[in-house]
Amino acid sequence: MNFTLTSAANAGVLIECGGTRLLLDGIRRAPFAPFLPTPPQILEQMLSGPETSRWRSVDFLLFSHLHPDHFDEEAVRDYLAGNRVREIFAPEWPFAAQGTARANAFALANGGWRDFEIAPGIILRAIGTAHAGEQFASVRNHAYLVATDQARILFVGDGDYVPEWYLPAGHVDALFVNPLFLNSRAMPEMVRQHAPKTVYVYHLPAAENDDLQARFYRRVAARGAKKLPEGLV
């Protein structure tokens, strides 16, 4: 089984595979500069679109952590109230699950991992890391590996730049990192140990945003890409 991936802006990604849908860090209404919230047209589909919309009633909601550029409690509550979700995965969870959803919140040690067979032939592996940055060192982050017999994709979230923590992911076909991770000293080792065919940079400001922060993240991403083999990013 192969994957179809769709951006929901910023760090949000809709992951579809063999009829199973996962939404990672993808439900945000509140702005958090310089990163865009979920686009209004997608948020409308999520909350009030037809039942046949691919954004409605996803099977699993995944959250790398609960910072406001990844998680919007009010918008997530609204989504759970109007959709049938099987399970939520996160390092922690701030409220009782609603509707059909089961909240599966657990912290993992750095480099620790747990596997879940979320559908026949599809494994979700949560990998524990600290959040990057000294000021956030106490914040737990889940990196997520989604794997089938044909493809393996690793999303690092905002995990710190310690390659050995991600070893449980093994070799991957695609690696999703934010601009700061891409430009970190850890990135060449990540490429060596995971051997991705493609590195995707997500958690970027909107292209039309040209303020100082947005320009900083774009410069960092461009600088990091130049350090890796041509065509990988």
Where are these regions (language model features)?
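Active-site beta-strand termini and strand-to-loop segments that position acidic
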Residues: 15-18, 118, 146-149
